[in-house]
Swiss-Prot record:
GO molecular function: DNA binding
Keyword set, alphabetical order: Cytoplasm, DNA-binding, Transcription, Transcription regulation
Name of this chain's protein: Uncharacterized HTH-type transcriptional regulator YvzC
Xref: CDD domains: HTH_XRE
Subcellular location: Cytoplasm
Family annotation (Gene3D superfamilies): lambda repressor-like DNA-binding domains
Residue ranges flagged as DNA-binding region: 24-43
Organism: Bacillus subtilis (strain 168)
InterPro entries: Cro/C1-type_HTH, Lambda_DNA-bd_dom_sf
Residue ranges annotated for the HTH cro/C1-type domain, each copy included: 13-67
């Protein structure tokens, strides 16, 4: 049975960090999340919750589909 999993467009965030010379800690502080949370979301270790999604969309001034996407995971295997 496929389950939707929200994923971040990691390449966008990493390129933003390079372009703006931001460390992960600096970006997390700007967004308003902990560095550990941002790291885990970017590495796919944690799904972003509503609060993190909202803060990131607000910070980047993007629509959901521009920063996140749905990945379908088969839970039956």
């Amino acid at each position: 049975m496929p389950v939707e999993k929200i994923q971040i467009r990691r390449d966008y965030v990493l390129q933003y960090m390079v372009n703006n010379d931001y460390s992960l800690n600096q970006l997390a502080l700007e967004i308003g999340v902990s560095p550990a949370t941002l790291s885990r979301v970017l590495n796919g270790e944690r799904r972003p919750g509503q609060l993190v999604i909202g803060k990131m969309l607000h910070y980047f001034n993007l629509k959901f589909e521009d920063l996140f996407y749905y990945d379908f995971v088969d839970k039956s295997q």
